[in-house]
From Swiss-Prot:
Pfam families, alphabetized: GFO_IDH_MocA (PF01408), Glyco_hydro_109_C (PF21252)
Record's comment on post-translational modification: Predicted to be exported by the Tat system. The position of the signal peptide cleavage has not been experimentally proven.
GO MF assignments: hydrolase activity, acting on glycosyl bonds; nucleotide binding
Signal peptide coordinates: 1-58
Keywords in alphabetical order: Glycosidase, Hydrolase, NAD, Signal
Family of the protein in this entry: Belongs to the Gfo/Idh/MocA family. Glycosyl hydrolase 109 subfamily.
Species: Streptomyces griseus subsp. griseus (strain JCM 4626 / CBS 651.72 / NBRC 13350 / KCC S-0626 / ISP 5235)
Assigned EC number: 3.2.1.-
InterPro entries, alphabetized: Gfo/Idh/MocA-like_OxRdtase_N, Gfo/Idh/MocA_oxidrdct_glycsds, Glyco_hydro_109_C, NAD(P)-bd_dom_sf, TAT_signal
Official protein name in the record: Glycosyl hydrolase family 109 protein
Region of interest (Disordered), residue spans: 1-32
Top-level taxonomy: Bacteria, Bacillati, Actinomycetota, Actinomycetes, Kitasatosporales
Note on how the cofactor is bound: Binds 1 NAD(+) per subunit. The NAD(+) cannot dissociate.
């Protein structure tokens, strides 16, 4: 998960959270709290101030109000550069990496960067010096020169980004820091990869798109679930036509995080839990949205055009606190307004439907749903099962293992990859570094990052407007109509 002091009892195939150093709660406002406060949760970056912050007792907005605000935000600003769709990396024999954020996620991902051939970790950054130094020790233990350590406060990442000997900056910090860090990296000439979600506001998403186009630097949402074995197999099968014409899909982040969010040692500070006091919508859509968007070639022949969201009451976190937390715990000052479960329906330009769910507050088994349906059959994950005509005609699910021949070449060549989450983390890092070394087009880009993250603010607004369908911006500015490469890549010649 984002920031921890000890390993978590997580399922092997559980997706990661972004995260690294977060200062413990204190009386004086941190840069993180100032960033969020001055940004204005009430607006979520799309002029929502009049609609309220999401307080459970606040009046709901009207559909016309919500539609007006979302339409204004969906309108593409004047382009400042040229499209980054289909733009290749420069190509280098060695990729020089700087890592910002060395908590639970960043502290484990550094092992994978070190395991990939042709990668050198040149710099590490975390305001908690002990974490930064532990990461630096991993670099030297791997036989690389000692990296420069940046640990002089929350702004020291800016000095890392200014270095002239970095090609790529990896960001794994609390969510509210993702946008300023990605922005700083690109302004200093670095390609940047950010853990989920890449930003929390629509205006920030547009800024990242414009910066990527203007600076000619790639800005990527590092969505590891796109590289899961099942996800990549379904992707290849979908593109080969085994599901027929695609109709619908579903993805989710349904993962009971109550124990971890209230654990004083797992995250450094309550930043993850505090998001449930700010927004009512889907805080973490990327793990479910990314793979299904790939199946449907979103931004590569289709696009996500609208979203409608509803949410349950916010009950479970307060109930958990009542049962588990002692009187006087800082959490008793918090008012939770984030829906226990949000359900969103995304419609594409071709009329397809994608269902997204988010629930980290109530008791349930882990699931990303990961389903895809078409005119010839359907796949559903958790547990994995498939039904395809003409093979299946008895109304009984079939064994997905029978379709192993459709595994992506990455999984055929790396059958037992190192790292967590069933190997998808390593696959993502390996493939990204390979694209950078060989001068290939990245599997996903800033337009995918913005599209997969747009449900964060838009679901909040739609829920406030009682489920009103709202437009999703076309971050590609029309480029989505063109067929281009994506995660379903061919094996390159080394």
């Amino acid at each position: 998960m984002n920031d921890d002091a000890r390993p978590a009892p997580e399922p092997q195939d559980m997706p990661p959270h972004s995260g690294a150093a977060d200062e413990p709660a204190r009386q004086d406002p941190s840069r993180r709290s100032v960033l969020w406060t001055t940004a204005g949760v009430a607006g979520a970056g799309i002029g929502l101030g009049a609609l309220g912050t999401g307080n459970a007792s606040a009046a709901e907005s009207t559909a016309p109000q919500a539609l007006s605000a979302a339409e204004a935000a969906a309108a593409a600003p004047a382009r400042q550069g040229r499209t980054m769709a289909g733009v290749r990396f420069e190509g280098r024999s060695t990729i020089r990496v700087g890592i910002v954020g060395l908590g639970n996620r960043g502290g484990s991902m550094i092992d994978l960067f070190l395991a990939v051939p042709g990668v050198q970790v040149k710099a590490v950054c975390d305001p908690v010096r002990d974490k930064a130094e532990r990461a630096a020790a991993k670099v030297t233990a791997a036989g690389q020169p000692a990296p420069t350590v940046y640990a002089k406060g929350e702004d020291d990442y800016e000095n890392l980004c200014k270095r002239g000997d970095l090609d790529f900056v990896y960001v794994a910090t609390p969510w509210e820091l993702h946008f300023p860090m990605a922005k700083t990296a690109m302004l200093n000439g670095k390609h940047v990869g950010v853990e989920c979600p890449i930003a929390m506001r629509l205006d920030e998403l547009w800024q990242l798109v414009d910066l990527s186009e203007r600076t000619r630097r790639h800005c990527m949402q590092l969505e590891n679930c796109c590289y899961g074995r099942n996800e990549m197999r379904v992707l290849r099968m979908a593109h080969a036509g085994l599901f027929g014409d695609l109709l619908h899909g579903a993805g989710a982040y349904n993962h009971d995080l109550r124990e971890l969010m209230f654990d004083p040692d797992y995250y450094e500070g309550p930043w993850r839990r505090l998001w449930h006091t700010r927004l009512r919508g889907d805080l973490y859509p990327n793990h479910g949205f990314g793979p299904v968007a790939n199946y449907m070639d979103v931004n590569r022949g289709d696009r996500a055009s609208s979203i409608s969201s509803i949410g349950t009451p916010a009950l479970s976190l307060a109930e958990y606190r009542k049962e588990r937390m002692p009187a006087g715990d800082p959490s008793w000052k918090e008012s939770y307004i984030g829906a226990d479960r949000t359900i969103s329906l995304v419609q594409t330009a071709k009329g397809r439907v994608i269902r997204l769910e988010h629930d980290v507050s109530s008791p349930h088994p882990y699931s990303r749903i990961n389903s895809l349906g078409g005119t010839r059959g359907v796949f559903e994950d958790y547990p994995e099962r498939i039904y395809l005509e003409p093979t299946n005609t008895n109304h009984q699910w079939d064994d997905f293992k029978k379709y192993a021949e459709w595994d992506h070449w990455l999984w055929k060549e790396h059958a037992n990859p190192p790292g967590g989450h069933g190997g998808m983390d390593y696959m993502m890092v390996f493939r990204l570094m390979q694209c950078m070394r060989l001068g290939l087009v990245p599997d996903f880009d800033v337009y995918d990052a913005a599209t997969w993250t747009a449900p964060v603010p838009l679901s909040h607004l739609s829920i406030k407007a009682k489920g009103a369908p709202l437009p999703i911006p076309d971050f590609t500015r029309g480029e989505w109509k063109k067929t281009r490469s994506g995660v379903d890549s061919e094996k390159p010649a080394e």
